[in-house]
């Protein structure tokens, strides 16, 4: 790509570096992958993350993401549940404890600090 065009189509990037799916797997054998597209001033990172079907618990960092593909449900430690489908725009806050149930491989474009 170029310094300006980071990906021609982020929906179809091959999976990136394999990373832990969460801090604790609670269902199935999910795998996660991450492709960092840009590191911006300070600690701001832009990338694509995906996870296969299964369930995990995690502790979040500050992040905003847009779901590109797939289907999942995220339950937050305050009891709120968010259904994730393509087009959903979600904010995560540092320190939040979450439970992810991925029903169909989930792919998201994220911006995090």
Question: What residue ranges belong to the model's regions?
Answer:
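A short, N-terminal "cap"/entry segment at the start of jelly-roll beta-barrel domains
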Residues: 1-47
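Conserved short histidine dyad/triad with adjacent acidic residue
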Residues: 40-60, 93-94
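Conserved hydrophobic/aromatic beta-strand scaffold that supports enzyme active sites
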Residues: 46-48, 64, 81, 89-91
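Short, conserved beta-strand element in jelly-roll/cupin
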Residues: 51, 59-74
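Ligand-binding loop in jelly-roll beta-barrel domains
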Residues: 81, 88, 94-113
């Amino acid at each position: 790509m170029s310094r300006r065009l980071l990906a021609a189509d982020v929906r179809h990037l091959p999976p990136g570096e394999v990373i832990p799916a969460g801090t604790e797997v609670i269902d199935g054998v999910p795998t996660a992958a991450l492709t960092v597209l840009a590191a911006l001033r300070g600690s701001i990172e832009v990338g694509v993350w995906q996870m296969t079907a299964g369930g995990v618990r995690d502790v979040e960092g500050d992040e905003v993401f847009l779901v590109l593909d797939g289907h999942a449900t995220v339950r937050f430690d305050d009891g709120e549940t968010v259904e994730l489908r393509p087009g959903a725009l979600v904010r995560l806050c540092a320190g939040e404890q979450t439970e992810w149930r991925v029903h169909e491989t989930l792919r998201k474009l994220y911006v995090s600090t």
